[in-house]
Amino acid sequence: MKVYFCGSIRGGRDDAELYHRMVAKLQSFATVLTEHVGRRELGDTGEHVTQGDRFIHDRDVDWLRQSDVVVAEVTQPSLGVGYELGRAVDMKKKVLCLFRPSSGRRLSAMIRGADNGDSFVVRDYCQDEIEQVLEDFFSNQK
């Protein structure tokens, strides 16, 4: 199984440590195509690739096409994550969006309203339960 993990990069890296934990857990279930999102040292300027933004876009869309499941941490608002989710829906990918209400933020209605309980799932969670949330989700994906 291949997982495309979405998390904010240029929109802010406040959750970088959490992304690291999530990617580590996801790797116990599947190949994570976007493991770089979980790198603690990745700053909000993004990756330093000489090929530029077009290269990043095309590479990531290719990874999205290859993926079986998309897991997105959506607490930190990010235009890129929203774009990835829209593309994932268009590609008919199974999507799990994870949101922490304790952040004080409100999740966009375009994300929460897309939850259909099947191919697009939005789950509220607390940081200390993230590993269990992922285990529960992936135990139903086999």
UniProtKB/Swiss-Prot annotation:
Organism encoding this protein: Tetraodon nigroviridis
Top EC class, one word: hydrolase
Subunit structure: Monomer and homodimer.
UniProt catalytic activity: 5-hydroxymethyl-dUMP + H2O = 5-hydroxymethyluracil + 2-deoxy-D-ribose 5-phosphate
GO cellular component annotations of the record: cytoplasm; nucleus
Subcellular localization(s) per the UniProt record: Cytoplasm; Nucleus
Gene expressing this chain: dnph1
One Pfam family, short name: Nuc_deoxyrib_tr
Coarse class of the protein's main subcellular location: cytoplasm
Official protein name in the record: 5-hydroxymethyl-dUMP N-hydrolase
Annotated binding of 5-hydroxymethyl-dUMP, by residue: G7, I9, R10, G11, S78, G80, E84, S108
UniProt keyword list: Cytoplasm, Glycosidase, Hydrolase, Nucleotide metabolism, Nucleus, Phosphoprotein
Superkingdom of the source species: Eukaryota
BP-aspect Gene Ontology terms: deoxyribonucleoside monophosphate catabolic process; nucleoside salvage; nucleotide metabolic process; positive regulation of cell growth
A molecular function GO annotation: 5-hydroxymethyl-dUMP N-hydrolase activity
Function: Part of a nucleotide salvage pathway that eliminates epigenetically modified 5-hydroxymethyl-dCMP (hmdCMP) in a two-step process entailing deamination to cytotoxic 5-hydroxymethyl-dUMP (hmdUMP), followed by its hydrolysis into 5-hydroxymethyluracil (hmU) and 2-deoxy-D-ribose 5-phosphate (deoxyribosephosphate). Catalyzes the second step in that pathway, the hydrolysis of the N-glycosidic bond in hmdUMP, degrading this cytotoxic nucleotide to avoid its genomic integration.
Family: Belongs to the 2'-deoxynucleoside 5'-phosphate N-hydrolase 1 family.
E.C. numbers: 3.2.2.-
Higher taxonomy: Eukaryota, Metazoa, Chordata, Craniata, Vertebrata
